UniProtKB/Swiss-Prot annotation:
Pfam families: YidD
Organism name: Burkholderia cenocepacia (strain ATCC BAA-245 / DSM 16553 / LMG 16656 / NCTC 13227 / J2315 / CF5610) (Burkholderia cepacia (strain J2315))
Role played: Could be involved in insertion of integral membrane proteins into the membrane.
Keywords: Cell inner membrane, Cell membrane, Membrane
InterPro entries, sorted: Membr_insert_effic_factor_YidD
Membrane topology per record: Peripheral membrane protein
Domain of life, source organism: Bacteria
Basic and acidic residues: compositionally biased ranges: 75-88
Intracellular or extracellular location(s): Cell inner membrane
UniProt similarity note: Belongs to the UPF0161 family.
Name of protein: Putative membrane protein insertion efficiency factor
Length: 88
């Protein structure tokens, strides 16, 4: 699923974004943010973070630097615990 979402973002960046121009008020751009969020957090959480970011990108927003949050150590610990329980 991650691969499909990233491919769609790449298509948007190559085919659609040049026609719209550079309108994002944030760094990195919303499409780059979405790609990074999906790569770091997976398809579901990454899409959620990307949608939240796009909703914040509007003419009344000051914009600025808005980096993808690092993966939560609690989430990673839960994933490792699940992986260990499946090995038993």
């Amino acid at each position: 699923m991650k691969t499909v979402l990233i491919a769609l973002l790449r298509f948007y960046k190559v085919a659609v974004s040049p026609m719209l121009g550079n309108r994002c008020r944030f760094y990195p751009s919303c499409s780059d943010y979405a790609r990074e969020a999906i790569q770091y957090h997976g398809a579901a959480r990454g899409t959620y973070l990307a949608v939240r970011r796009v909703c914040r990108c509007h003419p009344f927003s000051a914009g600025g630097i808005d980096l993808v949050p690092p993966p939560n150590s609690d989430t990673r610990a839960r994933g490792e615990a699940d992986a260990r329980s499946h090995r038993l």
